[in-house]
Amino acid sequence: MSPPLDSALEPLSEYKETAFPRTEKDPSQYKEHDLVTPEKEIQTGYFSPRGSHSSHGSHDSSASSNISLDDARMSDVNNSPNVFHDDPDTIDEKLSMYWKAANETVIREPYDYIAGIPGKEIRRKLLEAFNHWYKVDEQSCQAIATTVGMAHNASLLIDDIQDSSKLRRGVPCAHEVFGIAQTINSANYVYFLAQNQLFRLRSWPQAISVFNEEMVNLHRGQGMELFWRDNLLPPSMDDYLQMIANKTGGLFRMIVRLLQTSSRQVIDVEQLVDVLGLYFQILDDYKNIREEKMAAQKGFFEDLTEGKFSFPICHAIGEGAKNRTALLHMLRLKTDDMKIKQEAVCILDNAGSLDYTREVLYGLDRKARSLLREFKTPNPFMEALLDAMLSSLQACH
């Protein structure tokens, strides 16, 4: 058996070359015609309320046939006041002219329901910790925090539907309350609202690119996890770790890369982000089996009920556990039966998979702290975050 930490980190060595792609230009190097700025979006009519162009009077039908759509749009703009005034909030103000607050409440309700329930706040703490080094201003930090928080909570709405989950943070999942269709629409809607927050940043062209890239990675990771589950195809440990790098690591990288777009500090944190992403997700997999608090909030060994290949399960199957076939059958059942779940835990125990997972987690904790010591500037926020994760691991029975 290979050393736990080495086997956990090795699959990411090639991935790290593309995890933090470098932007070719900073915003100051873009020429004006290269960018479609929010001001230009307003000018070309993309954000104009329905019917707003008709208010400027009718055009001669014979002349209009020779006028391009862009010319028509610009004609309207030239005869109307500048509504943007360099303030992104104006976009929302224009949209609100024909969109009622009551309607907004209705379509956001599934999202607001889950967002209003306190979570781990790991992403907010990560942003605070990394910004200790990047020193991004408070207003930009708030925009980044809002973007990542909205994207994360919206992804949970979709996650719970795809996993047929019943509980989230100790309460019924949003789709159990509002229905599947409305919850899907609310989640997708909030993805775009999250992206719109980035227009508040001076570096918004880079920030939008980062957001899109990491949302693509998130969906790649989620897609592979669903494929393995629905086809009962056990992934290799390498494939599983790559999935984590995309799904969980995607939002972690989004935080750091968005901070980088707004910072003058040049600090290489790639390896630390990789380790934290692995640490967080594998710890979550372990707690799903071993932590009483998570059992109360989501249900004991909910990963088995969802038919999900978690880190301990992947290890047991990969090691050729004596009852490998029985474990696969239990995953296929997607059962809530406590006796079956307890039998599955016994299989993992006998295969040494829970001990292995715990050993990997302690190794990741040591690795993260070793990397932290290499930075010139001490980071008490990152130390506190690691301490909290270690305490959570130690609390598992």
From Swiss-Prot:
Residues holding Mg(2+) 2:
D159, D163
What's one Pfam family the UniProt record gives for this protein? polyprenyl_synt
Q: Which pathway? A: Secondary metabolite biosynthesis; terpenoid biosynthesis
Sorted keywords for this record are: Isoprene biosynthesis, Magnesium, Metal-binding, Transferase
Instruction: Show the PROSITE patterns listed in the entry.
Output: POLYPRENYL_SYNTHASE_1, POLYPRENYL_SYNTHASE_2
Region (Disordered): which ranges? 1-67
Q: Which GO terms describe its molecular function?
A: (2E,6E)-farnesyl diphosphate synthase activity; dimethylallyltranstransferase activity; geranylgeranyl diphosphate synthase activity; metal ion binding
Q: Name the positions where dimethylallyl diphosphate binds.
A: R168, K247, T248, Q281, N288, K298, K308
Annotated transmembrane regions: none
Task: Report whether Transferase shows up as a keyword of the record.
Answer: yes
Compositionally biased residues, Low complexity: 52-67
Q: Where does Mg(2+) 3 bind?
A: D284
* Residues that, per the record, bind Mg(2+) 1: D159, D163
Enzyme's top EC category: transferase
Query: Which ranges are annotated Basic and acidic residues under compositional bias?
Result: 13-42
Catalysed reaction equations from the record: isopentenyl diphosphate + dimethylallyl diphosphate = (2E)-geranyl diphosphate + diphosphate; isopentenyl diphosphate + (2E)-geranyl diphosphate = (2E,6E)-farnesyl diphosphate + diphosphate; isopentenyl diphosphate + (2E,6E)-farnesyl diphosphate = (2E,6E,10E)-geranylgeranyl diphosphate + diphosphate
**What does this protein's record comment on cofactor binding?**
Binds 3 Mg(2+) ions per subunit.
Its EC number(s): 2.5.1.-, 2.5.1.1, 2.5.1.29, 2.5.1.10
Q: Where does isopentenyl diphosphate bind?
A: K120, R123, H152, R169
Query: What causes induction of this gene?
Result: Expression is positively regulated by the cluster-specific transcription factor pbcR.
Reported cofactor(s): Mg(2+)
Q: What GO biological process terms does the UniProt entry carry, in alphabetical order?
A: alcohol biosynthetic process; isoprenoid biosynthetic process; mycotoxin biosynthetic process; terpenoid biosynthetic process
Q: Which domain of life is it from?
A: Eukaryota
Functional summary from the UniProt entry: Geranylgeranyl pyrophosphate synthase; part of the gene cluster that mediates the biosynthesis of the diterpene ent-pimara-8(14),15-diene (PD). Within the cluster, the HMG-CoA reductase AN1593 functions in the mevalonate pathway, which produces isoprenoid precursors. The geranylgeranyl pyrophosphate (GGPP) synthase AN1592 is needed in the formation of GGPP, the precursor for diterpenes. Lastly, the pimaradiene synthase pbcA performs the 2 cyclization steps that convert GGPP to ent-pimara-8(14),15-diene.
The record's family statement is: Belongs to the FPP/GGPP synthase family.
Its name, as the record gives it, is Geranylgeranyl pyrophosphate synthase AN1592
Whose protein is this, by species? Answer: Emericella nidulans (strain FGSC A4 / ATCC 38163 / CBS 112.46 / NRRL 194 / M139)
